[in-house]
């Protein structure tokens, strides 16, 4: 008699998810009808008017209710302001990319346009604007072999950030599975350059999983950053359907745990999207898994479908539910929790609490303000 292992159990659960949560067909049918890798390679093609306004029309939610328009809590103002325009201009001049723009983040105006520029937050996307992976929630362009790295990017990034005089910067990157070191040294060099030119700026790096290679994780963890972020994105049960198949839930947890083992002083952070069909029990399990792997900070945000090629929204989670998960996470013991429909992993990363937490851990309480 064959012994059924953990992988077989997960496989069984995955097929159950495909047949029960997506009533229109099984997992194989979903993959066949869903976006192919080629679709992700051609994401520059503009949407039609009907596709662009799809979510402003009648949407049937899992509970049977109908939303005729996008919920009011998901609408944002057109980004304006001096800071917003200045940062955008500098980015173009330095040939830099931001995940704020590439991922169509709804908070770009709020993060870039703050009246107090020391509280403004920009998220620079390193290693180009094209990823080697094709996650089914992400709007960043995809290619098996993106262009070569810009050797001047670390210097240009550091110089631009120095000129902005921000208090907090977030660095993220595309996945570069085509590179020997998967981009780890490029990220680390950028962090080191920033700290050389502007040592007062707090640096958060939202990193890939580096295919689970802990030697590469260590290169970034030891580069001088203040916050090491890596997103699990969703609950374990949904991971195979949401993320690229090379990214696994357990691998992401291992990355976060290894960072804390390597650099105990570093703050570790992750993000979870809601609205993909996850259950409360699965979210609670995820939070407990994160704590067991020594994660300090967690954020919750609403999944928004960027194009018709991506996963459909299963639920528009009400703001009160986000408040509920914030309270649950805080009671469980996370040091900081940001939770709301429009929250993204780098959303308001430079809030007072986060900055004070970092300064306290670095032994600089005199510079703290409340």
Curated annotation (Swiss-Prot):
Iron keyword on record: yes
Gene Ontology biological process terms, A to Z: lipoate biosynthetic process; protein maturation
Reactions catalysed, as given in the entry: [[Fe-S] cluster scaffold protein carrying a second [4Fe-4S](2+) cluster] + N(6)-octanoyl-L-lysyl-[protein] + 2 oxidized [2Fe-2S]-[ferredoxin] + 2 S-adenosyl-L-methionine + 4 H(+) = [[Fe-S] cluster scaffold protein] + N(6)-[(R)-dihydrolipoyl]-L-lysyl-[protein] + 4 Fe(3+) + 2 hydrogen sulfide + 2 5'-deoxyadenosine + 2 L-methionine + 2 reduced [2Fe-2S]-[ferredoxin]
A molecular-function term among this protein's GO annotations: metal ion binding
Cofactor, free-text remark: Binds 2 [4Fe-4S] clusters per subunit. One cluster is coordinated with 3 cysteines and an exchangeable S-adenosyl-L-methionine.
Binding residue positions for [4Fe-4S] cluster 1: 100, 105, 111, 346
EC number: 2.8.1.8
Cofactor(s) for this UniProt protein: [4Fe-4S] cluster
Keyword annotations of the record: 4Fe-4S, Iron, Iron-sulfur, Metal-binding, Mitochondrion, S-adenosyl-L-methionine, Transferase
Annotated Radical SAM core domain residues: 116-335
Chain positions recorded as [4Fe-4S] cluster 2 binding sites: 131, 135, 138
Gene3D superfamilies registered for this protein in UniProt: Aldolase class I
Top-level lineage group: Eukaryota
Pathway: Protein modification; protein lipoylation via endogenous pathway; protein N(6)-(lipoyl)lysine from octanoyl-[acyl-carrier-protein]: step 2/2
InterPro entries: Aldolase_TIM, Elp3/MiaA/NifB-like_rSAM, LIAS_N, Lipoyl_synth, rSAM
Cellular component annotations (GO), alphabetically ordered: mitochondrion
Record localization: Mitochondrion
HAMAP family given in the database record: Lipoyl_synth
Note from the entry: This protein may be expected to contain an N-terminal transit peptide but none has been predicted.
Family: Belongs to the radical SAM superfamily. Lipoyl synthase family.
The name this protein goes by in its record: Lipoyl synthase, mitochondrial
Species assigned in the record: Schizosaccharomyces pombe (strain 972 / ATCC 24843)
Gene: lip5
């Amino acid at each position: 008699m064959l012994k059924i292992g953990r992988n077989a159990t997960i496989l069984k659960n995955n097929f159950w998810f495909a047949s029960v949560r997506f009533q229109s067909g099984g997992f194989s049918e979903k993959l066949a009808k869903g976006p192919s890798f080629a679709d992700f390679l051609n994401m520059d093609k503009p949407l039609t008017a009907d596709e662009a306004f799809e979510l402003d029309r009648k949407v049937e939610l899992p509970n049977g209710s109908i939303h005729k328009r996008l919920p009011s809590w998901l609408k944002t103002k057109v980004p304006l302001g001096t800071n917003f325009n200045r940062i955008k201009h500098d980015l173009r001049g330095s040939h830099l990319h931001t995940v704020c723009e590439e991922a169509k983040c709804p908070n770009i105006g709020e993060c870039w346009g703050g009246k107090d520029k020391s509280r403004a937050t920009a998220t620079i996307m390193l290693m180009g604007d094209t990823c080697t992976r094709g996650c089914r929630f992400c709007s960043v362009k995809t290619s098996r072999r993106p262009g070569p790295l810009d050797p001047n990017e670390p210097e240009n990034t550091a110089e631009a950030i120095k000129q902005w005089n921000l208090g907090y910067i977030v660095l993220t990157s595309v996945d570069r599975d085509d590179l020997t070191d998967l981009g780890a040294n490029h990220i680390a060099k950028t962090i080191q350059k920033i700290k050389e030119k502007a040592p007062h700026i707090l640096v958060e790096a939202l990193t890939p999983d580096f295919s689970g290679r802990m030697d590469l994780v260590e290169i970034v963890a030891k580069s001088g950053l203040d916050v090491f972020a890596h997103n699990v994105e969703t609950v374990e049960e949904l991971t195979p359907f949401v993320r690229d198949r090379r990214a696994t839930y357990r691998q992401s947890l291992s990355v976060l745990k290894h960072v804390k083992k390597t650099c105990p002083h570093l703050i570790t952070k992750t993000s979870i999207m809601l609205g993909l069909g996850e259950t409360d029990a699965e979210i609670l399990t995820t939070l407990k898994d994160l704590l067991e792997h020594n994660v300090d900070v967690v954020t919750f945000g609403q999944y928004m479908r960027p194009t018709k090629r991506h996963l459909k929204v299963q639920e528009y989670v009400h703001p009160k539910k986000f408040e509920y998960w914030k309270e649950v996470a805080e009671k469980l013991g996370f040091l900081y929790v940001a939770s709301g429909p429009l929250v993204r992993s780098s959303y308001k990363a430079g809030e007072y609490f986060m900055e004070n937490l970092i300064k306290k851990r670095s032994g600089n309480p005199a510079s703290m303000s409340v």
